Amino acid sequence: MKTRLTFLASLVAISVGVAFALSEAAAQNPQMEQKVAEIKQASAANKQALARYTWQEQQVISVKGEVKKTVSYQVSVGPDGQQQKIELGSSAAPPPSGGRIKQHIVAKKRDEFQEYGQQVAALAKQYTQPDPQLLQQAYQQGNASLQLGGAPGTVTLLIKNYLKPGDSMTMVFSEGTKTIQSLQIASYLNDPNDAVTIAVQFAMLSAGVNHVATAQINGVSKQMTVAIQNFNYQLSQM
């Protein structure tokens, strides 16, 4: 029994040592350190430049492939660096016919889906604007790694435990323009079983400012999709 316990203790010690060594190796990788520094610098500078613009955003909310609501917003960036939205208009699918009980059930379900849609959209927003401090933290903890096989002139970075334990974010970064090209995120709301996947494509304005062009957010448990498109970027009159 004593021999078995000693063997198990040795295995645990080896596992901890290997994990620590891998974390240290990742944190000491000069190439990784350089790429993370470039992404942090580019993200911070781009966020500052984007704050000078206003634009329009359209959200199309679908459940099980059926469009339920379309909403348009005017978007600007406030003094605190957070996006501020003013609703410009919306259209919703016509309510089904039926008695009061059925209409009550439908209205309750609609409110539930609306709240859920707001939650997944808010979660996506935290990923589509990469935080330099969270990127640095992921690097220091050994949760960032370079992936092979990307397109020429790009670097693919896989980041785990970025915002929540067990999440992952795959970032494609252009070495030529020093901009993020795309993000693929696997995350969740309050429970890891309440999965949310996010696919983001970026585009560049003529002035060289990078922005989210499209985002598709999938709330798996409710089979909800929120498709977002940003357009009509204008320098704000300040």
Write out the residue ranges for each language-model feature.
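Bacterial N-terminal signal peptides that target proteins for export
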Residues: 1-13
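C-terminal segment of classical bacterial N-terminal signal peptides
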Residues: 14-24
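N-terminal leader/targeting segments and the immediate start of mature chains
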Residues: 22-56
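Short, surface-exposed loop/turn motifs at beta-strand boundaries within globular domains
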Residues: 32, 46-54, 68, 139, ...
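Polar/charged side chains located within well-ordered beta-strands of beta-rich proteins
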Residues: 43, 57-59, 211, 230
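Solvent-exposed N-terminal domain segments of exported/luminal and surface proteins
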Residues: 46-103
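Flexible, processing/modification-adjacent segments and terminal tails
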Residues: 91-167, 177, 188-192
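Gly/Pro-enriched, hydrophobic low-complexity segments
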Residues: 148-238
